[in-house]
Amino acid sequence: MDNGLFLINTHNGIRNKLPRIDINDYPAVKTHLDQYWDRISTRSDKGDTPYNLRNCAYLEDFSKPKVMWKIIGCNINFCFDEKQLICNNAVDIMTGDRDSLIQFVGLMNSKLFDWYLKLTTEAEVQGGGIQLYVTTLEKTLLKLDFQQPLTDIVYQRIHNQVTDATVDMAVFEAYNLTLEEQAFIMQDKRVNKNREE
């Protein structure tokens, strides 16, 4: 949505790849920032000049294929991004091998992992949601070397060509869950809580 507002990234550059932003190339931005000279000139987190942001170790990650997810919510939905989207600090990102990222999205958006995360995550917030720390995911043992059909099914889901139920069944099959185990997860109130919201 274009509301006439823009985020201006006066970055400090990326070593040997991208020069820092020269504020003199953007006179309107410089004029605006000059109003705050007393504050920006004395801040401790500046880049090479007071106009530049400090170095961001993961700036390049935003231009890579990645998984993005909100940190807090009743339903933590994971999305696969290949469009170089940039997010704020209420969203975490993960980069890696494209097929592994797609599989990760499928697993994490499945009812199996929705159930698992709600069962094992202790950081519950008001309203029944959870706060999903990166450290929680780091401790979650995930198999991400499934056969190509799972990757293809998840990719089709990303493009709205199949349903969530199709992905759920593929994940159940990948983990060899019995019909009884599948039914248990599908009927658990934690999985279905706020699913329609």
How would you name each of these model-derived features?
Residues M1-L150, E173:
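Polybasic, glycine- and aromatic-enriched phosphate-binding surface used to engage nucleic acids
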Residues A28, K143-E197:
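Non-catalytic DNA-recognition/assembly elements of restriction-modification systems
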